Swiss-Prot record:
Mg(2+) binds at residues 232, 253. Residues 218-370 form the TrmE-type G domain. The gene is mnmE. This is tRNA modification GTPase MnmE. It comes from Xanthomonas axonopodis pv. citri (strain 306). InterPro entries: G_TrmE, GTP-bd, GTP-bd_TrmE_N, GTPase_MnmE, MnmE_dom2, MnmE_helical, P-loop_NTPase, Small_GTP-bd. Exhibits a very high intrinsic GTPase hydrolysis rate. Involved in the addition of a carboxymethylaminomethyl (cmnm) group at the wobble position (U34) of certain tRNAs, forming tRNA-cmnm(5)s(2)U34. Keywords: Cytoplasm, GTP-binding, Hydrolase, Magnesium, Metal-binding, Nucleotide-binding, Potassium, tRNA processing. K(+) binds at residues 228, 247, 249, 252. GTP binds at residues 228-233, 247-253, 272-275. One of its GO terms (biological process) is tRNA wobble uridine modification.
Length: 448
């Protein structure tokens, strides 16, 4: 998809779909004010509200409302922007858009207003993505994290780190010009120390971005275990509703069941699965295959065992969970144990029926979801998978640069620093291909 042209004027409905009290049509581009004049809004002044009747080509009134002009470059897109605020009737809003197109505008593509804001330097790529994340936020915590990303909290940290890597690269490339001199005499120790500090900063930024990604996307947690361990009962207890069928018959669950729950503003998707065991009929075996497939994309495995027979339960699971990096072992049905029974100290003892241990389970889930410091949200920002991937590449190149410096391979070290800087530039859009930009903005809402 090609990037937006600043010579055209675009139009779209900017308010939410459906019927509402107020509807907004947004224009952006060089003809915005001229089109507004043809609609019947004459002598507009920037940043003043003008009451007007919006008319069609025959002079008939389409609607009446308020018109606002945000003159370039003092607007969201950096261009002349006119917003027409009328009644929230989809029929009237579509008619108003059609009239603007008759007057020379064209229908905006999804995300094209934000794309123009990016191209005109009003915000960087991470901030533009934060707009979509703010709109789609499912809870207050995610919304606040997206707001911080939109305010530039994430971008500023990325830019500061990129600047540090640039300075280090300048020192390394300067040393290349004096190849006959030992690196230490050219400030090599300071470069290594500086790179070490930059790697620490990068590692922390990566951890924070991963946490921000979880805030945006939520966590995929798979309930896994042998039949009749109480996985479905536990899902119902955590969800607060009878989402899964529960019986005393082993193998009741044959398919996967997804249920999203909120943990203090964090979304956790629980996946109930078929119990793992040897044998079973064809349908049950297919259910077990799907359970293992869910584990392959799980962020967290909730291993549910019957506390009355832990060894047999562990044997039934086998190596199914080995591929999941994070696991939480849950000993269910603890209410059926005698007082003398002892459980693994690293596991959580719960009863899905009585509710015993569920509060502790919630606490552990929060900690696993967001890591250390889950109660400190002041610095949280939203992030996306591509941001995390870019930071990981930057970390790999920074580590490689440190290794090459140790061998005094200055040309290779300089190249690794360049690649680390390039990976960071992809986050903010300073170094992004047009096809990547097009893919990102096409996922936005129309009118944004």
């Amino acid at each position: 998809m090609s990037m937006s042209s600043s010579t055209s004027t675009i139009v779209a409905i900017a308010s939410a779909a459906g019927i509402g009290g107020v509807g907004i049509v947004r224009l952006s581009g060089p003809q915005s004010v001229q089109i507004a004049a043809h609609l019947g809004i004459a002598r507009m002044q920037p940043r003043h509200a003008h009451y007007a009747r919006f008319r069609d080509g025959h002079g008939a009134v389409i609607d009446d409302g308020i018109a606002l002009w945000f003159n370039a470059p003092h607007s969201f897109t950096g261009e002349d922007v006119v917003e027409l605020q009328g009644h929230g009737s989809p029929v009237l809003l579509r008619q108003l858009v059609a009239r603007c197109i008759e007057l020379g505008a064209r229908q905006a593509r999804a995300g094209e207003f934000s794309e123009r804001a990016f191209l005109n330097g009003k915000l960087d790529l991470a901030q533009a993505e934060a707009i979509a994340d703010l709109i789609a936020a499912g809870d207050l915590r995610a919304a606040r994290a997206a707001r911080r990303a939109l305010d530039g909290v994430f971008s500023q940290r990325v830019d500061a780190l990129a600047e540090t890597l640039t300075r280090l690269r300048i020192h390394v490339e300067a040393a290349i010009d004096f190849a006959d001199e030992p690196l230490d005499t050219l400030g090599g120790n300071q470069v290594r120390d500086g790179l070490g500090q930059a790697r620490n900063v990068l590692a922390q930024l990566l951890r924070d971005a991963e946490r921000g990604r979880k805030l945006r996307d939520g966590l995929h947690a798979v309930l896994i275990g042998p039949p009749n361990a109480g996985k479905s009962s536990l899902l119902n207890a955590l969800a607060g509703s009878d989402r899964a069928i529960v019986t005393d018959v082993a193998g009741t669950t044959r398919d996967t069941l997804h249920e999203a729950i909120q943990l203090d503003g964090f979304e956790l998707t629980l996946v109930d699965t078929a119990g793992l065991r040897d044998g079973g009929d064809a349908i049950e075996r297919e259910g077990m295959r799907r359970a293992r497939a869910e584990l392959e994309r799980a962020d967290l495995a909730l291993v549910v065992l019957d506390a009355r027979d832990l060894q047999a339960a562990r044997d039934a699971i086998g190596d199914a969970i080995d591929t999941v990096p994070r696991q939480l072992w849950i000993h269910n049905k603890c209410d059926l144990l005698g007082n003398a029974a002892s459980l693994d100290a690293n596991a959580i003892a719960v009863s899905a029926v009585t509710g015993q241990g569920l509060e502790q389970l919630h606490i552990r889930l929060r900690a696993l979801a967001l890591g250390d410091g889950v109660d400190s949200v002041d610095g949280e920002f939203s992030a996306r998978t591509r941001h995390v991937q870019a930071l990981r590449r930057a970390e790999q190149h920074a580590d490689a640069a440190d290794l090459e410096l140790g061998f005094e391979q200055l040309e290779l070290a300089a190249e690794e620093l360049r690649l680390a800087h390039e990976a960071l530039g992809e986050i903010t859009g300073k170094l992004s291909a047009d096809d990547l930009l097009g893919k990102i903005f096409s996922s936005f809402c129309i009118g944004k």
